[in-house]
Every structure is written in structure tokens, then in C-alpha cells.
């Protein structure tokens, strides 16, 4: 074999190896992407029975195309030789929350509430360090404590309308714990035919300013604007999560297959590279 043929063959092998390594990296990023999607999906399934939980999802985004050149090849007027462009795989583009309304579950409990429409209950949440801040939730499973305050199952205070609109954690709702309560669709609370308070319901102008906190609560980040809600309060019901378990299971199977396909690609490229190094290189 003449020197010119050897040079041509060597260059061809170099170009081929670049695309083989690219195949490895593309498969690797694809597997990482599918693993992240699986983590999100698993969290959705784990919270399928969580009151007011909102489904999360993720979008895929490709890395920017990179210009590939031959390493140390400046034979063309001293300029690097181009191999073309290549995409270096995919990654999670954005994790988003689906705020669509879940189904209502009838409980006939007078302190259980669901919101029909856009909006959130306002909760004065106290963390383990004793710090209190206003959170927003669609979970209306409340109780009346011994002091007569309307609270969540964890004991955090439910805010009235003034507290909800102004993020006033001290604007609590207090009723007579010994009397039954009735609540209309505007959230007005009645005992003995007299209004004793109003459940605070507020909406957010742009949901992109909501950050998930825990399983079914949200923080309003800087720049977020509260606004009046048109949601109707339904007594004796709780909003379930908006998770479709069957659909999520189908997606899990699809993701698992995509992950396995990435494994097969890596194995195939690994075997091919092994032959290139140990067999083709000897020729």
C-alpha cells in the first residue's frame, strides 16, 4: 500500500472515530435525559393521591450544534479541516407544572373545600425553624382546631380574604368550634345565619412566578402579582391531583424503552470502537 493510500485511510479512520465518540456522547445524554424524565414521572405517580397536587413535566432540548474539525490537520493552507456540524445530544429544556384542575372528591365534611376555577387558598405556613410565610395551595382539606381557627391538617392557619390578597400571615379565620359552619361559593362563612368570616382565595397573574414548595404548596417569587380570583368555593369536596395514572404508566414504559435503546447504542459503539482500536489499527 502506497503512502498516499495510507494517509487517506488514516484520515478516514480519524473521521469515523469522531462520529463514533459523538454517538457515545449522544446516547449518554439521551439516557441522562430519560432518567430525569423518569424521576419527574415517578414523583407524579407518588403524589397521585395527594390533594391538589399538580402534574409536572419536562421538555427536551438539543445542545447547540458544534463545528467539528480535524485535530492538528492544517494541510489546507494552514487552516483546520472541517468535518461538518454535529449535535451533541439532548438535555432537559424546562420543567413545568400543569395547573389544570383535578377531579372533585365528595367527602361531605363541612371543613373540606375545593376551588372550581383558577385560584388558590392562602396558608400561613410555619417551617421547622419557626418562620412563618404565606404559601398557596389547592388542597382544601381543613379542620377547626380547639381555639376555633380554621387550619390545615398540619396545623397551619388558613387566611381570610384580606390575608390572601395582602399576604398578611396574621389574618386568620376564627369560628365557634361548637357550631356547624356553612360556606357559600364566594367563600363566606356562616354560623347561626350570620357571616363570621371569608375564606381567602387569590389568583396569580402569571403562574411562572410560582415556585413549588413541598408536595402541593407554592411560593410567590419576586415579581409575582396577586389578583382577585373568580374561582367558586365548593363545600364538602376536595380536589384530587390531576394525575392520570394510566397515562403516566404508559409514559414510564416509553421512557424505559428509550433508556434501553440508549444502552444498546452505547454497547454497539463500544464494540465497534474496540474493533477499530484492536483490529483496524493493526492493518
Regions found by a protein language model. Name each.
Residues 2-283:
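Amphipathic alpha-helical polymerization modules
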Amino acid at each position: 500500500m502506497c503512502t498516499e493510500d495510507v494517509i487517506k485511510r488514516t484520515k478516514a479512520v480519524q473521521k469515523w472515530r469522531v462520529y463514533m465518540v459523538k454517538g457515545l456522547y449522544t446516547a449518554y445524554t439521551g439516557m441522562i435525559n430519560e432518567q430525569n424524565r423518569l424521576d419527574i414521572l415517578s414523583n407524579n405517580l407518588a403524589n397521585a393521591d395527594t390533594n391538589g397536587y399538580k402534574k409536572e413535566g419536562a421538555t427536551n432540548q438539543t445542545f447547540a450544534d458544534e463545528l467539528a474539525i480535524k485535530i492538528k490537520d492544517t494541510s489546507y493552507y494552514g487552516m483546520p479541516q472541517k468535518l461538518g456540524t454535529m449535535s451533541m445530544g439532548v438535555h432537559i429544556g424546562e420543567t413545568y407544572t400543569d395547573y389544570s384542575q383535578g377531579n372533585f372528591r365528595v367527602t361531605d365534611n363541612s371543613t373540606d373545600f375545593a376551588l372550581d376555577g383558577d385560584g388558590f387558598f392562602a396558608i400561613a405556613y410555619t417551617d421547622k425553624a419557626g418562620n412563618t410565610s404565606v404559601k398557596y395551595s389547592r388542597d382544601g382539606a381543613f379542620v377547626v382546631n380547639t381555639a376555633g381557627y380554621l387550619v390545615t391538617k398540619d396545623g397551619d392557619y388558613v387566611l381570610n380574604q384580606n390575608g390572601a390578597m395582602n399576604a398578611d400571615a396574621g389574618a386568620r379565620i376564627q369560628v365557634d368550634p361548637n357550631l356547624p359552619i356553612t360556606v357559600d361559593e364566594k367563600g363566606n362563612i356562616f354560623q347561626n345565619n350570620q357571616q363570621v368570616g371569608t375564606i381567602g382565595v387569590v389568583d396569580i397573574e402569571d403562574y411562572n412566578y410560582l415556585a413549588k414548595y413541598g408536595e402541593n404548596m407554592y411560593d410567590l417569587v419576586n415579581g409575582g402579582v396577586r389578583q382577585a380570583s373568580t374561582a367558586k368555593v365548593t363545600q364538602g369536596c376536595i380536589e384530587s391531583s390531576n394525575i392520570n395514572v394510566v397515562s403516566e404508566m404508559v409514559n414510564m414504559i416509553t421512557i424505559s424503552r428509550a433508556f434501553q435503546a440508549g444502552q444498546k447504542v452505547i454497547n454497539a459503539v463500544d464494540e465497534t470502537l474496540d474493533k477499530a482500536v484492536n483490529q483496524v489499527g493493526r492493518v
